[in-house]
């Protein structure tokens, strides 16, 4: 299993995210999220990643209920939200996305996820249930329960 690391909120992390901006999906950039967190330096980092050598090959933003969009998730008092999860193309198919999800599942809380970039089948394969709803941007909403 790959080692998931919490990413610091600083300009070095912004530099590490550069490869994702250059080669990744524009819906998953995390630019606004990172810069917003840098403004509030007192907050804990919601960003996690997997390094492959010196390269950040995979990353996710894992938030607690109330920190991001709360719609489409009735019936849960406390939960986490995987706001965005991305593995660079050169590192796909190596289990890094699954490792990030396993890390989130190990928190022991239900997880809500917005399936962007045709990732719905991946999340279903990982045990998520399709709520058969979409968010305001038209992305599918899925949930995992412990």
Curated annotation (Swiss-Prot):
CDD domains, A to Z: NAT_SF (cd04301)
Residue intervals of the N-acetyltransferase domain: 7-146
UniProt-listed Enzyme Commission number(s): 2.3.1.-
Keyword Chloroplast: no
Keyword vocabulary terms for this entry: Acyltransferase, Transferase
Broadest EC class assigned to this enzyme: transferase
GO molecular function annotations of the record: acyltransferase activity, transferring groups other than amino-acyl groups
Coiled coil: none
InterPro entries per the UniProt record, alphabetical: Acyl_CoA_acyltransferase, GNAT_dom, YlbP
NCBIfam families membership: PRK13688.1
Protein name in the entry: Uncharacterized N-acetyltransferase SSP1595
